[in-house]
A protein has these predicted regions:
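The feature marks helicase ATPase cores and/or their adjacent C-terminal helical subdomains
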Residues: 1-632
Length: 632
């Protein structure tokens, strides 16, 4: 590690990036930008220099520099820093993909026809092999019918619609997944589409590239390979990949003509935390960061607690008390702001259990393609309840009839122009809407807590809101279907089974889930706090609460043997649960700006302690047992 340096160590990186972004001789690059490296500052600095150097030329040729961000917040921040300059097209990945394809209606129709026909064929093959008359069979036939209905509407669509930040449930709407898949397919298979992209955007920069959809990243790599007059710049860090649909090992095995600049400084974390995350990372790729020379030492403590304790909240409060004593920072305990200490969990299962919506969460998390949408709140079936039903019921409970009217008028198909035309008087539509709202609200009479399935069926009957595709099959079931007994074979549709389980939970779970993903709770995860930083962090490691097969702190800390699946993955070079867990541990620890407390609940205290010391992650003095805590 470098020992003699100053805080200007990374200044040369901006010059390297600017050299790559030369319109006359463009080069592609992967910028390694680790935790707190000042990546956004570098990005903005380089873009401002590009504007000074090439702004007039780009404007004259009607070209732009495209910047793809991961979140809306990051997008807004960069736009603000660039003072809304039209030279730059800053957008999220979904917005960018939609802008690429939105005008190619005929091509989109062809893609949808091919995809829908393929899906119908697959379902019909499954139906031919399955047992007739079961609930699975009835549901599958409805899925086939719904897909055929969508096929039949394609010819009537003159223009497709898509909202990157909302729900896409109209007949002419594309889903988030479809927009990404279509744009990637067009880039890979249509040379004209590639040409249009690079003519419009001679420079394309991707922030948080390790978490950007891998199919689109792969397509962009193909475009760059075939078009050397195009600069593709990726900003990221493979150790910070937290979503499963990001490209693995991005930044390694790059083409020989790619540049690989690296930012070494960590401007965020105190020196002790930087040392810790370097040690955690050492067995992954060995990349190390350097703390700022003017950073304080900071504090790190590791609390090892037996898993069978039954008072975890009290223990964690005692840990905060101990951290206040160790650090001399009373904000660990004496703060009117409950978020003064950010509690970060391994993953959402832990927070879901602690907040009381684990049955809702666990049922949907089983389905791999649902996970990302569940983690960020964008899953259409979930948004149906959080964005339509929840605001409506809250407004009704508060007696805010104006808000009720606004929600219904904006979101109900009853107020679509084509529906209003079917009625002689608009008052008839209003009466129907009021009846539907009152019928829905009646489910909460006497302070009842209705099941999600009852809410879904009520809305499906009244047609107050459009039912998302993922819930249509269930909403279309009749009373006759409810008595059909399904078989116990593997013929069951996992997505419908997951929703059946989720819909059996109560509306209270939706409220708690929404509070969590809206950051209205004290809990956060590596996913939910992406890009954020906190003065005081309490990290909770608990495999029992996590319930996840994707991660295991017990394995990482040597308290549990590696599974056969892990061993098999190691042999073929695939990612293991230990590697995933190491990444998440790294991501959580690097959030701390002043002090970090880690509590590990384990079935083998000695093994965890020995691994922590042997790996040089913590010193003996930094490891504290249960008996040193003043538990109240």
């Amino acid at each position: 590690m470098i020992t003699d340096y100053d805080n200007c160590l990374d200044d040369k990186v901006d010059e390297e990036l600017l050299a790559c972004l030369n319109l006359q001789n463009p080069k592609s690059f992967f910028l390694f930008a680790g935790a707190g490296s000042g990546k956004t500052r570098s990005l903005v600095n380089v873009l401002e220099q590009i504007k000074d150097k090439y702004g007039d030329e780009l404007k004259l040729r009607r070209k732009n520099v495209a910047i793809i961000t991961y979140t809306n917040a990051a997008c807004d921040e960069i736009i603000h820093r660039l003072k809304n300059d039209p030279t730059f097209a800053v957008s999220t990945i979904h917005s960018f993909a939609w802008e690429l394809i939105r005008h190619y209606t005929a091509d989109i129709k062809n893609w949808l026809r091919n995809t829908l026909n393929k899906e119908i064929d697959e379902l019909e093959i499954e139906e031919s092999k399955g047992r007739p008359g079961t609930k699975t069979s009835v549901d599958r036939k409805r899925k086939i019918e719904n897909k055929k209905n969508r096929l039949s509407t394609l010819d009537r669509i003159s223009k497709f619609a898509y909202n990157p930040n909302g729900d896409n449930i109209e007949d002419n709407s594309l889903s988030h997944t479809e927009v990404i898949s279509i744009s990637a397919f067009f880039l890979e298979n249509k040379p004209l589409f590639q040409k249009i992209l690079i003519q419009k955007y001679p420079i394309l920069l991707v922030d948080e590239s390790q978490d950007t959809k891998k199919e689109l990243i792969n397509a962009l790599f193909m475009v760059q390979e075939k078009n050397k007059n195009f600069s593709l710049g990726l900003f990221g860090d493979t150790m910070q990949r937290i979503y499963t649909d990001g490209k693995e090992n991005l930044g390694t095995n790059l083409p020989n003509d790619w540049y690989k600049p690296e930012k070494k400084l960590n401007h965020r974390c105190p020196k002790r935390v930087v040392t810790l995350i370097n040690k955690i990372r050492s067995d992954a790729d060995g990349i190390e960061q350097l703390p700022r020379t003017d950073k304080e030492d900071g504090f790190v403590r590791f609390f090892i607690i037996p898993s069978d304790v039954d008072n975890k909240i009290a223990i964690e409060n005692a840990i905060k008390q101990k951290m206040a004593e160790i650090t001399g920072d009373d904000l660990w305990i004496n703060s009117s702001d409950e978020k003064a200490v950010k509690t970060l969990t391994l993953e959402h299962h832990m927070a879901a259990k602690r907040m009381g919506f684990d049955d809702l969460f666990a049922s949907l998390y089983k389905v791999e393609r649902y996970r990302i949408g569940l983690l960020d709140g964008s899953l259409p079936g979930i948004r149906f309840f959080t964005q339509f039903v929840l605001p409506l019921i809250e407004a009704k409970r508060n007696g805010d009839e104006f808000a009720v009217s606004r929600i219904v008028r904006l979101n109900s198909p009853m107020f679509k122009r084509e529906n209003i035309k079917l009625h002689e008087k608009q008052t008839d539509v209003i009466k129907s809407a009021n009846t539907a709202v009152n019928s829905l609200f009646s489910l909460w009479k006497n302070n009842d807590n209705p099941k999600l399935l009852d809410i879904l069926n009520n809305i499906a009957k009244s047609k107050l809101f459009v039912i998302p595709d993922s819930l249509k099959v269930i909403a279309q079931r009749t009373d006759k279907d409810s008595v059909i007994v399904d078989d116990s074979s593997k013929d069951i549709d996992e997505s419908i089974a997951a929703w059946d389980e989720a819909l059996s939970t109560t509306f209270e779970k939706i409220i708690k889930y929404n509070d969590y993903i809206s950051d209205k709770s004290m809990f956060g995860t590596h996913q939910g706090v992406k890009g954020l930083q906190f003065d005081r962090v309490l990290a909770i490691l608990d495999d029992d609460e996590a319930r996840g097969f994707l991660f295991s702190y017990e394995k990482l800390f040597g308290a549990k043997e590696t599974s056969d699946t892990d061993k098999k993955n190691m042999k073929v070079g695939k990612e293991t649960s230990i590697e995933r867990t190491r990444r998440l541990f790294y991501v959580i620890c690097r959030r701390a700006m002043k002090s970090l407390a880690i509590v590990a609940y384990t079935n083998n205290v000695d093994a965890v302690k020995n691994t922590a010391i042997d790996n040089d992650w913590f010193t003996k003095d930094e490891i504290l047992p249960l008996d040193l805590l003043a538990i109240k």
